[in-house]
């Protein structure tokens, strides 16, 4: 018995590998500080839990949900989007669809639009699912390097015309995982122009839209005039509402994009449990003060890590958004894998290597701000005690 040949092209999922290494270390008795995965350690807000409890007690939530989400959920998602980004008029029946978090919807979008021989334009480094989903769909991906000299934004002019003509999807993710980079509306305007020129669907993974610091508010690509002609945006309750395990979000924007995704979803999944949708509606109604309090926690953690690494010689700027700090490895290490292995072996610290996010992630590692302050300070202390410093 043999698995499909496509699996030979797909490496082990980065975060599953992190979990495996964590479990092995814990089994050896190592006190692990796991800063490998962006899984918030704070609880889901009480009002969301209360809505969930009430919905579970309602027998009408116990049967199959609508494939594209309940009407109430899609209306609430569209209303939240309008309040947050100032862009309204999205029809809940044709321009909004529920999703099982973001990962499922991202993967299914590739199945909806990519045929064998088609190209997808993928940032590098990036969330690994963009690359693997291209392979599952039978397409080819063209890596767009995110380079410091371009403010970690892809250079669309560097995409060869022969590739652009065959491209079906252009993927973006700002605020960016893993780099923490942000994008302006001016950049998104260039993206929309490029997509219209080449008849490409822009897929903006905006999972970190609410995870920003120092008063910064990340934009939506759909704020650009004409963007809904070529773009869809993926949003999730996971990070902003501490609901990673609940698996609920939505996709909004271009009708063809939503229809294609919906056609795949109706044949693959059976929607989101209606009680979870009710809970998410309650989350959409939370005021900004709760989010500000949450982000104050993450901002303090960001400062602990950035200042701690600076004290060990790292040349870092504090990221404006996301739950991550993206940092270079010391030159004394030959690769990012070697460096993160040393952190695990010498310090009991788990972080992912940059090359797990693509070729242009080599030479970097990512720190997730999802452990308590005291454990972050302890991590810096362990690195100092082990003699791990940055040497340019």
UniProtKB/Swiss-Prot annotation:
Annotated metabolic or biological route of this protein: Amino-acid biosynthesis; L-lysine biosynthesis via DAP pathway; LL-2,6-diaminopimelate from (S)-tetrahydrodipicolinate (aminotransferase route): step 1/1
Pfam families the UniProt entry points to: Aminotran_1_2
Residue sites binding pyridoxal 5'-phosphate per the record: 67, 102-103, 127, 177, 208, 236-238, 247
InterPro entries membership: Aminotransferase_I/II_large, DapL/ALD1, LL-DAP_aminotransferase, NHTrfase_class1_PyrdxlP-BS, PyrdxlP-dep_Trfase, PyrdxlP-dep_Trfase_major, PyrdxlP-dep_Trfase_small
Matches recorded under SUPFAM superfamilies: PLP-dependent transferases
Record's catalysed reaction(s): (2S,6S)-2,6-diaminopimelate + 2-oxoglutarate = (S)-2,3,4,5-tetrahydrodipicolinate + L-glutamate + H2O + H(+)
Positions annotated to bind substrate: 13, 38, 103, 127, 177, 366
Stated family: Belongs to the class-I pyridoxal-phosphate-dependent aminotransferase family. LL-diaminopimelate aminotransferase subfamily.
Complexes and interactors: Homodimer.
PANTHER family in the cross-refs: AMINO ACID AMINOTRANSFERASE, L-GLUTAMINE--4-(METHYLSULFANYL)-2-OXOBUTANOATE AMINOTRANSFERASE
HAMAP family in UniProt: DapL_aminotrans_1 (MF_01642)
Protein name as it appears in the record: LL-diaminopimelate aminotransferase
Species: Gloeobacter violaceus (strain ATCC 29082 / PCC 7421)
Lineage, uppermost ranks: Bacteria, Bacillati, Cyanobacteriota, Cyanophyceae, Gloeobacterales
Gene field: dapL
């Amino acid at each position: 018995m043999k698995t499909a040949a496509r699996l030979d092209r797909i490496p082990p999922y980065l975060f599953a590998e992190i979990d495996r290494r964590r479990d092995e270390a814990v089994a050896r008795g190592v006190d692990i500080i796991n800063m490998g995965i962006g899984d918030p350690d704070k609880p889901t807000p009480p009002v969301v839990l209360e809505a969930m409890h009430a919905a579970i007690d309602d027998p009408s939530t116990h049967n199959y949900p609508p494939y594209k989400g309940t009407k109430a959920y899609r209306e609430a998602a569209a209303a939240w989007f309008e309040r947050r980004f100032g862009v309204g008029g999205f029809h809940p029946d044709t321009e909004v669809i529920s999703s099982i978090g973001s990962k499922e919807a991202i993967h299914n979008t590739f199945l909806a639009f990519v045929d064998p021989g088609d190209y997808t334009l993928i940032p590098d480094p990036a969330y690994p699912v963009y690359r693997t989903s291209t392979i599952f769909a039978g397409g080819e991906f063209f890596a767009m390097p995110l380079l410091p000299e371009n403010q970690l934004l892809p250079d669309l002019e560097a995409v060869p015309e022969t590739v652009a003509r065959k491209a079906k999807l252009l993927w973006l993710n700002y605020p960016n995982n893993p780099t923490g980079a942000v994008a302006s509306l001016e950049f998104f305007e260039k993206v929309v122009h490029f997509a219209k020129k080449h008849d490409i669907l822009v897929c903006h993974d905006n999972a970190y839209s609410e995870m920003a610091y120092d008063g910064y508010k990340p934009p939506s690509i759909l704020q650009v005039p004409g963007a809904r002609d070529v773009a869809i945006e993926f949003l999730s309750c996971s990070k902003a509402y501490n609901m990673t395990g609940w698996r609920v979000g939505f996709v909004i924007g271009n009708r063809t994009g939503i229809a294609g995704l919906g056609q795949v979803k109706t044949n693959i999944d059976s929607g989101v449990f209606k009680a979870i949708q009710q809970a998410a509606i309650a989350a959409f109604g939370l005021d900004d003060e709760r989010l500000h309090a949450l982000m104050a926690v993450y901002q303090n953690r960001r400062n602990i890590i950035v200042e701690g690494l600076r004290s060990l010689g790292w040349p870092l700027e504090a990221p404006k958004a996301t739950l991550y700090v993206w940092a270079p490895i010391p030159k004394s290490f030959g690769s990012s894998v070697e460096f993160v292995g040393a952190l695990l072996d010498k310090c009991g610290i788990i972080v992912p290597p940059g090359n797990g996010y693509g070729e242009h992630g080599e030479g970097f590692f990512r720190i997730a701000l999802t452990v308590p302050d005291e454990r972050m300070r302890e991590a810096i202390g362990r690195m100092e005690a082990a003699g791990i410093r940055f040497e340019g």
